[in-house]
Amino acid sequence: MKGIILAGGSGTRLYPLTRAASKQLMPVYDKPMIYYPLSTLMLAGIKDILIISTPQDLPRFKELLQDGSEFGIKLSYAEQPSPDGLAQAFIIGEEFIGDDHVALILGDNIYYGPGLSRMLQKAASKESGATVFGYQVKDPERFGVVEFDNDRNAISIEEKPEHPKSHYAVTGLYFYDNSVVDIAKNIKPSPRGELEITDVNKAYLDRGDLSVEVMERGFAWLDTGTHESLLEAAQYIETVQRMQNLQVANLEEIAYRMGYITADQVRELAQPLKKNEYGQYLLRLIGEA
């Protein structure tokens, strides 16, 4: 399976911060925002990842993450000249996807919770169909909303409905089989002129091929698209790291624990940083601090 991070958009909700840098390069406590969705794909066992962003921002992502080899992964990059909808990612990434299945994650979404890696790897291992994730919210009219029957089977999905049929939002993380490329090519732009991811999910639902996994109590899904939610996410990450004495979205740690890099490689990455807490954390990880 391959992965795509959609890190485009104009960032108008975070203006004027986004005059200085892409939204997905903003700090969320102690790491760039892009680290969080990248860590999610790595935890799913995905090592071949395409980052899609605007022509003006893409060089900054390349400078930050380069080819991904220091984390034992392969990173590629592609331009999205204009924000024409989330489903456009599969058209832009068609050649990258090839004959593989693909996961898409939005560049401003953060996930954290017990058993997250197992849940992600289960979704990534499915042979066919699509898997998305439902999360209970107080303001479902802001999201794509999924309706369930009494057996927790998805029966409808609506994009930002005026009268939501449930409080379960579809989060910004999606796993698809290879037919997603053809589906994306054949959906029509919505009234706002975008290729909606909800229409992709509806296509899978109509053919009986959509699985919705509910993120239960204990999971956190953070959408960092506003000033308030960006601050809340930073405070959440700080609290988790301080209370649990661990790092969230530490790419070197995840790469090591997933077997993508060795202890020697971690040591090499940590040495230039050994005078700060980040480097000390990496050295403790391999038992050398």
Curated annotation (Swiss-Prot):
Return any one Pfam family short name: NTP_transferase
Q: Which reaction does it catalyse?
A: dTTP + alpha-D-glucose 1-phosphate + H(+) = dTDP-alpha-D-glucose + diphosphate
InterPro entries noted in UniProt: G1P_thy_trans_s (IPR005907), NTP_transferase_dom (IPR005835), Nucleotide-diphossugar_trans (IPR029044)
Kindly state which keywords UniProt assigns to this record, in alphabetical order.
Answer: Capsule biogenesis/degradation, Magnesium, Metal-binding, Nucleotidyltransferase, Transferase
Q: Protein name, please?
A: Glucose-1-phosphate thymidylyltransferase
Its pathway, per UniProt, is: Carbohydrate biosynthesis; dTDP-L-rhamnose biosynthesis; Capsule biogenesis; capsule polysaccharide biosynthesis
What does the entry comment about cofactor binding? Binds 1 Mg(2+) ion per subunit.
Write down the superkingdom of origin. Bacteria
Q: Which GO molecular function terms does the record list?
A: glucose-1-phosphate thymidylyltransferase activity; metal ion binding
SUPFAM superfamilies assigned to the protein according to its UniProt record, in alphabetical order: Nucleotide-diphospho-sugar transferases (SSF53448)
Query: EC number(s) per UniProt?
Result: 2.7.7.24
Q: Which cofactor does it need?
A: Mg(2+)
Species of origin reads Streptococcus mutans serotype c (strain ATCC 700610 / UA159)
Q: Which CDD domains match?
A: G1P_TT_short (cd02538)
A single GO BP term for this record reads: dTDP-rhamnose biosynthetic process
Q: For binding Mg(2+), which residues are annotated in this chain's numbering?
A: D108, D223
Q: Main role?
A: Catalyzes the formation of dTDP-glucose, from dTTP and glucose 1-phosphate, as well as its pyrophosphorolysis.
* Name of the gene encoding the protein in the UniProt record: rmlA
According to its UniProt record, which protein family does this protein belong to? Belongs to the glucose-1-phosphate thymidylyltransferase family.
